[in-house]
Amino acid sequence: MNQEVMNLFNPTTPAQVFDQIRISIASPEKILSWSYGEIKKPETINYRTFKPERDGLFCARIFGPIKDYECLCGKYKRMKYKGIICEKCSVEVTLSRVRRERMGHIELAAPVAHIWFLKSLPSRIGLLLDMTLKDLERILYFEYYVVLEPGLTALKDRQLLSEEEYLRAQDEYGQDSFTAMIGAEAIRELLKGLELERLEAELRAEMQATESDIKHKKLAKRLKIVEAFRFSGNKPEWMILTVVPVIPPDLRPLVPLDGGRFATSDLNDLYRRVINRNNRLKRLMELRAPDIIIRNEKRMLQEAVDALFDNGRRGRVITGANKRPLKSLADMLKGKQGRFRQNLLGKRVDYSGRSVIVVGPELKLHQCGLPKKMALELFKPFIYSRLDAKGLSTTVKQAKKLVEKERPEVWDILDEVIREHPVLLNRAPTLHRLGIQAFEPTLIEGKAIQLHPLVCAAFNADFDGDQMAVHVPLSLEAQLEARVLMMSTNNILHPANGQPIIVPSQDIVLGLYYLSIMREGLPGEGKVFGDMAELEHALHSGVIHLHTSIKYRWDQTDENGEPIKRLIDTTAGRVMLGQVLPKSQKISFDAINKLMTKREISGVIDQVYRHCGQKETVIFCDRIMALGFYNAFKAGISFGKDDMVVPHGKWKIVDTTRALAKDFEQQYNDGLITHGEKYNKVVDAWSKATEEIAKEMMKEISSTKKDAKGIEAQINSIYMMAHSGARGSPAQMRQLAGMRGLMAKPSGEIIETPIISNFKEGLSVLEYFNSTHGARKGLADTALKTANSGYLTRRLVDVAQDCIITQDDCGTKLGIKMRAIVDAGTVVASLGSRILGRTACEDIRNPASNEVLIERNTLMEESHVDQISKAGIQEVKIRSALTCELINGICGKCYGRDLARGTPVNHGEAVGVIAAQSIGEPGTQLTMRTFHIGGAAQINEQSVIESNFDGKITIRNKAIARNGEGHLVAMVRNMVVAVVDADGTERATHRIQYGARMHVDEGDMVKRGQRIAEWDPYTRPVLTELEGTIGFEDLIEGQSISETLDESTGIAKRIVIDWRGTRGGADLRPAIVIKGKDGKVLKLPRGGDARYMLSVDAILSVDVGAKVKPGDILARISTESAKTRDITGGLPRVAELFEARRPKDAAIIAEIAGTIRFGRDYKNKRRISIEPVDQEEETREYLIPKGKHIHLQDGDIVEKGDFIVDGNPAPHDILAIKGIEELAAYLVNEIQEVYRLQGVLINDKHIEVIVRQMLQKVEIIDQGETDMISGEQIDKIEFDRLNLKAQEEGKKIATGTPVLLGITKASLQTRSFFSAASFQETTRVLTEAAVNGKVDPLEGLKENVIVGRLIPAGTGASMAKIREVAVKRDRLILDEREKQAAIVPSAPEAEPLALPPAE
């Protein structure tokens, strides 16, 4: 049988097999080779016959027939004429599908510039020719001539001449003495004339010679593009088009609408304009029209082609009939609706349905309820085939009829088909991978999908009208993956933090909490029971109560597996809970012999999962769900108004606070404190009062009273709900029954007057009005932040999508150090929690005995973590994604444990995407959750340090003075207090704030919880180091200092004002000096005068002539007033960190260790230099704006990395000064802090994976003898490759320094141009890729989705691996054969080779 006929039944041609895709500029010859004919007419179809016009935009001769196997005039019809070209209408008889593939072309009468290479910044044509875009446009749009060949005239090469100048030059020098041209032809000639090799040599020489930085950068840019053209095989003149390709007609269709009108693609309009203008230009040229007319027509042609390629990039946007801009070729690719994001990365799928979800409490964890109607529709093909197999129908048509009639046998078959065939459920928005899970369907009546209550947390679903989509995996492989990887029973742990996500919530928690309550004095207290039957009998007959304290004999096994029985003090409810616990010696009854809150239950599930495995966990979860629901229903807990108990002491607390606030008001009136300080203190006092009232209320609500018989009363219902974690929080209870507290303005500032009422008492009108502020802000925030958070997730996924586990071990010796994170004296993240599931980088030794506890390259399990905390180790070095040395992807050892499975991570796990989802998902969650506390102000300021351990104090860099009041005061910024225990190990170190009051001294013994130091968080002091008398310098009334008299009190306070703006104030340097008895300025012990510089807004605390002692305060600088912290500030903060933006007031960090010296001021900046300790370093200078407070004095000693001026440090500075490890620690801690404030747990490794992706580039400092250009940014991998090459050739290698890129920039600079183009700035990415002739190796996930393959992660990774091995073996076999052939010229059949074993 003929191959063509075979193709009839299998029309899909075999897919091309390719490993890489290359993009480059199309040459005119290339465009012609694609084309099937030239389009000469702008017509589309004939208005009477509706057939395409010949040589028009839809011409059948060029593009192929309209109907399958039928020519246009109808002479040849049917298959048998396949391949014949009709002599009447010249149409080939073939499939009409070719109209989607065949291209045409338009021959342009005059060349035009390709707008992408002209206008997409930086202009490629401009860079190559070294001309500005303005000049290029003047030439292209026929305003100026350009001299190509000056000849012997005085004109210069590439000089621009206007019309008059051109004519004058012709008159002056004669017509043929020089060559000048205009329009795209001129540019084409210039580009053609470039000799790239010579140009490259010239540029390199020029770069060596130049001194100026700016010029060097400019030359580097040009050199880069010249090299790109040289190596890619593109010719510069191809950026000027002489032929325009026309895309196939079925990709720009003309669709008939009812009513005889047509809807057309915008491209047809754009092509029509090009053809019209081109034809007109041809005609004008034939007619030898005047130059000016031809020029105008050429300009219009250029504009038409520009609009076709990228409408609106230059000049006005071309609009259609309805004033809507026409969609050009570039718009087809760009944006959310473009080809990349709409059709290649996101496709609509068949076999799917959606419906509302309802709760299905009787389902098992792996099941979902699917409405029969839906299932029938979704599984239709399977039902047809089964009907056919059973002989119930002979044709598909018959089967269809049976199904439509819903005959009884169809339902039986549906049951069979559905059995063990998982379906996927998805709830939008799918923020992380748990948003799509597989379930086994059970058929139900009705039209709503039933969902298991425990998976709601993963989907973030509730039943207030949410909808979910169902998808059917069709192929066997898909079903297998759904069952093995995506089944809800396989997703028990959260990929972000490794804690269980199948956790009971709401009613279930309440029921379990109620079940585990123990109350005193109930009937039957102290009775002893031997087994469950006795217990149930006693319960039912009312001898004991569910909450009675009893003794019960519990059977369990000891360490050796021997059964033992022990008597346990417990309650009947807890025993019932114990019955569902899996039997294992690792899990004791004590796990549940306590009050079960949500957190406790989560802990138990975690234990069960770790010790008993997945199956047991799933059964356990289902059982406690049933138990919880049943007991919540039995308990009948309700919510009454008397359950909201307003504490007795409330008004007393309110009155004292009111008095305090009044007192602060008075102090302000007396001029003792500033307005800012008063505000801070008042806000502070009220937030303390709110806390106090909340505490009182909690105390009253949580206590249970006993009646005359000693029977303990039932616990308060509201307290039960909040305490168990079922619903509500202490913050909400506080607003119900305590006092609502402080409210925030939309700007984030706190309103000074709090809301004293609570919701039970009711708010006054004024209070209500005040509270609307915060509530409205919350709602507005929610709407805005959801979009922001989604965009953050998208950027994160894009930057990390090609991060995949590709090997087991990269063998690196590098790692990062981990220690516990302590904030305000409390441990917020213990060392154990941070290193769990990570790999040890070096042997971990016991500090006391020096024996090896854990060997290097061990994956830390829970047991190892316990060992470490027992040994009191404070710091552990672990492997990290940041230090992994693999070229592509990350190795399993550096990544550690797969958090969602609790086992070492598998090959092919897409850890980048998981990291991105783990960071992005809570962003959206939190933004949706801002308004829950109604904007009630949550203020947190740290101002004390307390010891966490018992031990002895040692102080490093000690400088303490006893001030005039007899207190000890810290006099330096780098003073560190350490607590050392009896063994001499440092248990904790605290950095002490400048000016803090010390409560301890060197060698003191402290107890746990004892205060070490405290300070005022709202002001920063300027202290004196010497005893003496005060003198002022440059503190001139009205110029640099303003004395404000408080009218009501008559007390003056003096503030330093901005002196730069005042007349004659530019040279002032306001300062306080300390004078000795002789009236001269004293010298400081470390050299320099005792002169203390003041910054703007400093408040003076002393007068001229006052006597001071060391440690006394000379002036105070107020820090900004307390703003509420809320993830609203948090999300932008996370984005700012990931984008590696420089903060507004960036801190200035010392690059070297040395001594501070003040230099001469420069304009209105202070000059500070650091004289290095190390003689080989050079002195560093910093210019600091005058108003900034510099808290260093002349002669202070700073360490490398110390802050000279406070603020948020710029991440780039940290990288440059302290290196990668410090930068990673900074970013991880800052990002974690934002999430921690909201109580969200994210494992550090996710953030590390993203930071690794931000550090992929190297900036070249010295190019050595390589082809790299100093100053350019290049991929680390490429950098290493070129250096290796240079080393092998014995040349000098290049040196570079790592650079930090923000996630957007990093995404746009990935090695794959497909991935970058589908992310943002499509035009720019594609232009650059084409110029460079880039090759996309198709390594990441996105590129493979775009070209329609399996992604190289998960099962796709193993397929890729197998393919790789196969290719290697084939190559080996071929090499062997070639060798054999070379040895034996004409040997008989050689014996079969021994193949290498398959991996």
UniProtKB/Swiss-Prot annotation:
Q: InterPro entries of this UniProt entry?
A: DNA-dir_RpoC_beta_prime, DNA-dir_RpoC_beta_prime_bact, RNA_pol_asu, RNA_pol_N, RNA_pol_Rpb1_1, RNA_pol_Rpb1_3, RNA_pol_Rpb1_3_sf, RNA_pol_Rpb1_4
Q: A GO biological process this protein is involved in? A: DNA-templated transcription
Described by its record, this protein's role is as follows: DNA-dependent RNA polymerase catalyzes the transcription of DNA into RNA using the four ribonucleoside triphosphates as substrates.
- EC category: transferase
This entry's comment on the bound cofactor is: Binds 1 Mg(2+) ion per subunit. Binds 2 Zn(2+) ions per subunit.
* GO MF annotation terms: DNA binding; DNA-directed RNA polymerase activity; magnesium ion binding; zinc ion binding
Native organism taxonomy? Bacteria, Pseudomonadati, Pseudomonadota, Alphaproteobacteria, Hyphomicrobiales
Organism domain of life: Bacteria
Query: Which positions does UniProt annotate for Mg(2+) binding?
Result: D462, D464, D466
Question: Which Enzyme Commission number(s) are on file for it?
Answer: 2.7.7.6
Tell me, how does this one assemble?
Answer: The RNAP catalytic core consists of 2 alpha, 1 beta, 1 beta' and 1 omega subunit. When a sigma factor is associated with the core the holoenzyme is formed, which can initiate transcription.
Name its species: Nitrobacter winogradskyi (strain ATCC 25391 / DSM 10237 / CIP 104748 / NCIMB 11846 / Nb-255)
Name assigned to this protein: DNA-directed RNA polymerase subunit beta'
Determine if Nucleotidyltransferase is one of this entry's keywords.
yes
* UniProt keyword list: DNA-directed RNA polymerase, Magnesium, Metal-binding, Nucleotidyltransferase, Transcription, Transferase, Zinc
Which positions in this protein are listed as binding Zn(2+) 1? C71, C73, C86, C89
Instruction: Provide the family line.
Output: Belongs to the RNA polymerase beta' chain family.
Q: Which SMART domains match?
A: RPOLA_N
Q: Which GO terms describe its cellular component?
A: DNA-directed RNA polymerase complex
Catalytic activity entry: RNA(n) + a ribonucleoside 5'-triphosphate = RNA(n+1) + diphosphate
Q: Where are the transmembrane segments?
A: none
Residue positions binding Zn(2+) 2: C810, C884, C891, C894
What cofactor does this protein call for?
Mg(2+); Zn(2+)
Keyword Disulfide bond present in the record's keywords: the answer is no
